[in-house]
Amino acid sequence: MMKARMLVLLSLALGTPSVVLAQAPVQLKFSRVVDLTLPIESNMAPIPGLKPYLNNPSRVNVISSITEAQKEALRAEGMTLSGDHEVNGRSMISVLSILVHNGTHIDAPRHMVENGIPIDQMPVAQFVKEGVLINLPGKEPNSVVTVKDVAESGVEIRPDTIVMINTGWTDKMWRKPGFWEQMPYLERGVAEYVANKGAAGLAIDVFPEKPLWRGVKLDPGEVWIANHLALMQKNLPLIQFVTNLSQIGNNRFTVVAAPLAIKGGEASPVRVIALVE
């Protein structure tokens, strides 16, 4: 636990490779840091029935270790050792293979919009914003997060904030049977409601669309990716499968969501933290 409040001055910049527009420094005061990110590991739970997930399981392959003792410790921790793993006396080295939409990740507009902005071209200032937390911990398995839930939560969605919706599902069910099969989901219109309030993005701990893999049907004329589109057509990011949101409490906080700068990419794994005042 930190004994004193910390003051961090972040100077953010926006621009293109040829033009950089300096912004005024952003002053952030916080007393603690909450990690909102699921760990990346081998065999992360895929969305049932979706081939991109099933055909591309996550892998963290350790190809070398320093000593035999380290190798056995890694094995005991559940790490995946490559078939050609070697003990080299020098260094541990790993190779990561992951579908970029697995675990805690951020979607850029290019994910759902043909000419959308790729993840590496989104302004980095868009990933450091004041956060707004909407707690909906009473959501039961297979339930729906509705526009009414969000509108009547008593939480003001301020412009230029990242809205975070907490059902507690990922905290309770990650790595457990039923994680996908009973997961609550967002009603069509939730993301549009948030975007129309002037939010800078949306972060959630569940899947944002109807779970077709368990037989939930679309309404006539309904587009399955409606919540994705509501954000991405406005160049707003969508962050999925955050965790530990309940640790923020009722405090003001700043969200820092740092994706990898994957050239031309539509999404990225992301380390999300909350700087809590």
Question: Which functions belong to the PLM regions below?
Answer:
Residues 22-277:
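Active-/binding-site microenvironments in catalytic and ligand-binding cores
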Residues 8-17:
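Bacterial N-terminal signal peptides
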Residues 1-8:
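Bacterial N-terminal signal peptides that target proteins for export
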